[in-house]
Amino acid sequence: MKSPDEVLREGELEKRSDSLFQLWKKKRGVLTSDRLSLFPASPRARPKELRFHSILKVDCVERTGKYVYFTIVTTDHKEIDFRCAGESCWNAAIALALIDFQNRRALQDFRSRQERTAPAAPAEDAVAAAAAAPSEPSEPSRPSPQPKPRTP
């Protein structure tokens, strides 16, 4: 299992700004097993992090001659547009890391549900076993004496 800090991919990625002109800003992207960190060009600025628990999907992949354009859709349905060099395949790397994260999370949820229901299961099994088990043999039943018919 990969540690959350293990870098899966690192390199240049461009993010479309939310400003009026929607300029493409170069970022240094660092992809780990639980997030995508975007470092701005200026070294003093803090990175922005897109954690996978807040991402729904990687969508709208379009290829042009030089770039691959894709959109990350967040859980609050915000769309963030990116582009990268065609050969870098950032969109595929992010999509695969997201799927891996979602699979791990689904397994954790499943295991935690099993652990919560596990203490109740032995009690249910004991009740079912008691109902299915034959009762302990009791004393053999004696035939009840029949009254003799009266003769006149």
Swiss-Prot record:
Recorded topology in the membrane: Peripheral membrane protein
Tissue expression summary: Expressed in placenta and adult prostate gland. In placenta, it is present in all cells of the villous cytotrophoblast. The protein is absent in cells from hydatidiform moles. Hydatidiform mole is a gestation characterized by abnormal development of both fetus and trophoblast. The majority of hydatidiform moles are associated with an excess of paternal to maternal genomes and are likely to result from the abnormal expression of imprinted genes (at protein level). Expressed at low levels in adult liver and lung, and fetal liver.
Residues bearing the modification Phosphothreonine: T151
Top-rank taxon, per record: Eukaryota
Keywords: Cytoplasm, Membrane, Phosphoprotein
Annotated Gene Ontology cellular component terms: cytoplasm; membrane
Positions of the UniProt region annotated as Disordered: 112-152
InterPro entries tied to this protein: PH-like_dom_sf (IPR011993), PH_domain (IPR001849), PHLA1/2/3 (IPR042832)
SMART domains given in the database record: PH
Keyword Flavoprotein: no
GO MF annotations, alphabetized: phosphatidylinositol phosphate binding
Any single biological process term in GO: regulation of embryonic development
Modified-residue entries (Phosphoserine), positions: S3, S42, S141, S144
Additional detail: The PHLDA2 locus is imprinted. Loss of imprinting results in overexpression. Imprinting is dependent on RNAi machinery.
Domain text: The PH domain binds phosphoinositides with a broad specificity. It may compete with the PH domain of some other proteins, thereby interfering with their binding to phosphatidylinositol 4,5-bisphosphate (PIP2) and phosphatidylinositol 3,4,5-trisphosphate (PIP3).
Similarity field: Belongs to the PHLDA2 family.
Protein name: Pleckstrin homology-like domain family A member 2
